[in-house]
């Protein structure tokens, strides 16, 4: 079995392109991970997700621990077998979802106690339990348990939260079962404070994670402030390990983050937007519900190879979405995921050529 490794093949300014080698295959970076929250990328077959060019997808610890349970998935052979996906899977730690429960959860040094949003049952999610769940799922890349610092946060609030994340990172690392081809990423926090981001990175580097994520962004701070943090945060992380910006997926945000040294991304934007009738193209977004597309015989994008563009007109997609047909959500999602994977492919090409990225080529 291959060992987990990251090799940078090309670098242009701060942007890097390379290959992550894992037990479940290679990941070309910069990489975009479609979100498969409950063991499925909504409105897509796993083989269709692979056809879009995706090398890896994301699963959600919080949702899978509730339904059908990590133990059941393990009994059935692990998440890869369960959902028929042979490529790498990264699972988040569940921390972000639990923190977003607000009134339903309580944070202590031990972990987070919360009530299920499904039936009200009480759970305790700790660094050890989160790591165990991800092991039971068979995750290729496990995320350390963290507290996602809310925005805005004062310096003291962000410091207290960051220090808790550091202590939880130690416990997550101790609980992680090391195996060839598998990895665990630590998550740096610190809100929008450079001093805290630097300290968080220093603390986590001591634990020698296989990769590092930048958490606590895309939580309402806006692109300008996010880029300001990304001007320095990736530089605090090891050059020879993958850097993952969690929850970021607007094309302009991805391009800006890649140019600042980020390698991996995930976001629900392409799938959620597709289900809501919004398509991404090189020339901007298309709201297919708009009546101006009712008699438009052209495809969404003439040079796109996805089934929606190769076989159907904007008029047909407009019709499907307006009447709420499931096929509309499927085709729009397929197109958006194809667009995002094509975007990542073009970004990798531009890095290899040593050129600044152009959206429209």
UniProtKB/Swiss-Prot annotation:
The protein's annotated pathway: tRNA modification; tRNA-queuosine biosynthesis
Bound cofactor: record note: Binds 1 zinc ion per subunit.
UniProt keywords, alphabetically: Glycosyltransferase, Metal-binding, Queuosine biosynthesis, Transferase, tRNA processing, Zinc
One Pfam family linked to the record: TGT
Active site feature: 92, 266
Binding site for Zn(2+): 304, 306, 309, 335
Record has Transferase as a keyword: yes
Subunit and interaction comment: Homodimer. Within each dimer, one monomer is responsible for RNA recognition and catalysis, while the other monomer binds to the replacement base PreQ1.
Function: Catalyzes the base-exchange of a guanine (G) residue with the queuine precursor 7-aminomethyl-7-deazaguanine (PreQ1) at position 34 (anticodon wobble position) in tRNAs with GU(N) anticodons (tRNA-Asp, -Asn, -His and -Tyr). Catalysis occurs through a double-displacement mechanism. The nucleophile active site attacks the C1' of nucleotide 34 to detach the guanine base from the RNA, forming a covalent enzyme-RNA intermediate. The proton acceptor active site deprotonates the incoming PreQ1, allowing a nucleophilic attack on the C1' of the ribose to form the product.
Name of the protein in question: Queuine tRNA-ribosyltransferase
UniProt source species: Rickettsia bellii (strain OSU 85-389)
Lineage of the organism: Bacteria, Pseudomonadati, Pseudomonadota, Alphaproteobacteria, Rickettsiales
């Amino acid at each position: 079995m291959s060992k987990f490794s990251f090799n940078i093949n090309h670098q242009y300014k701060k942007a890097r392109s390379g290959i992550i080698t894992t037990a479940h295959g290679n990941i070309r970076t910069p990489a975009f991970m479609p979100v498969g929250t409950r063991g499925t990328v909504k409105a897509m077959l796993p083989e269709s997700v692979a056809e879009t060019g995706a090398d890896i997808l994301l699963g959600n610890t919080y949702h899978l621990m509730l339904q059908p349970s990590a133990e059941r998935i393990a009994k059935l052979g692990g998440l890869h077998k369960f959902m028929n996906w042979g490529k790498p899977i990264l699972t988040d730690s569940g921390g972000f979802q639990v923190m977003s429960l607000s009134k339903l959860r309580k944070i202590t040094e031990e972990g987070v106690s919360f009530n299920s949003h499904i039936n009200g049952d009480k759970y305790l999610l700790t660094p050890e339990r989160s790591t165990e769940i991800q092991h039971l799922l068979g995750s290729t890349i496990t995320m350390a348990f963290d507290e996602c610092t809310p925005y805005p946060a004062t310096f003291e609030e962000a410091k207290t939260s960051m220090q808790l994340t550091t202590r939880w990172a130690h416990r997550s690392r101790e609980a992680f079962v090391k195996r060839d081809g598998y990895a665990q990423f630590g998550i740096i926090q610190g809100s929008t404070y450079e001093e805290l981001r630097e300290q968080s990175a220093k603390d986590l580097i001591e634990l020698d994670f296989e990769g590092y994520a930048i958490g606590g962004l895309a939580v309402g701070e806006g692109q300008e402030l996010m880029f300001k943090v990304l001007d320095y945060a990736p530089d605090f992380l090891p050059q020879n390990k993958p850097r993952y910006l969690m929850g970021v997926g607007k094309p302009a945000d991805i391009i800006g983050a890649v140019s600042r040294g980020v390698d991996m991304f995930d976001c629900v934007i392409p799938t959620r937007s597709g289900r809501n009738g919004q398509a991404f193209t090189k020339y901007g977004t298309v709201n297919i519900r708009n009546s101006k597309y009712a008699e438009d015989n052209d495809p969404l994008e003439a040079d796109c190879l996805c089934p929606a563009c190769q076989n159907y007109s904007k008029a047909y997609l407009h019709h499907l979405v307006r009447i709420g047909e499931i096929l509309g959500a499927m085709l729009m999602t397929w197109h958006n995921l194809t667009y995002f994977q094509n975007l990542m492919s073009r970004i990798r090409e531009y890095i290899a050529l040593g050129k600044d990225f152009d959206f429209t080529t």
